[in-house]
Amino acid sequence: MAKVIVYDEYTNRLFTYNLSENDPMPYAYGNTMRVREFRGSSNSPTLWTTTRAMEAWNLTRRRYGKGIYIGYAFKRIWEGGHGTASQHYAGVSFDVGQNVSYSQRVAIRNAAVATGAWGYVEPISMTPTWVHFDRRYGTPACSGTTAGYPTVRRGSRSTYVLILLDALNALGYTNRPLDGIFGGGTENAVRAVQRAVSLTADGICGCNTWKKLTAASVGIGRTRTVID
């Protein structure tokens, strides 16, 4: 069984589903994406994504017209496998098409671009043996880039808050449940991180705080303070 948390950007709410590995992902139409496919190589019992990521998948799948193999999707930040600001940790990124021909990957990429639903579709020249697309959302905290995570603060709700909570727990700054809600305890934990790395302790996770926190937590493995 897996616990799947879905953030709905339209209502700013998070919903939790308890599903088996062969169940369809919430909001994915038909059986086009099962929990085990979204999980990929992650060993986490808890997964998360957004309604808009699933909608983008649905549009791409319909436009392409047949099955799309998913090589990698979800990862928790302490599991690593991707960069320090990867959208895979937010549950909105997919690396697909590893088992088909180059021409078929081009067709998948073209379908993804044509939907206009993804925040980013990687050029085929950068990923010639797979297709990458993600449904990033929010304005990146660091200026001059379209990558990275948005600023989150007390009252924020999102899968980016889930990344923050997961990193704080893994590093032992807090033991908050993974609910995707930035509350007072999370604010205090962010201040503790900021003090530890000589940043202004304002309790807001912006550009520099994200950089320090993700660099310290990405790929460190499951620690004794990780919470599922």
Go through each PLM region and give its residues.
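Intrinsically disordered, low-complexity
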Residues: 1-42, 139-159, 166, 171, ...
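Catalytic cores and adjacent binding grooves of peptidoglycan-active enzymes
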Residues: 4-7, 84-92, 98-172, 180, ...
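Surface-exposed helix-capping loop/turn segments at secondary-structure junctions
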Residues: 66-68, 173-177
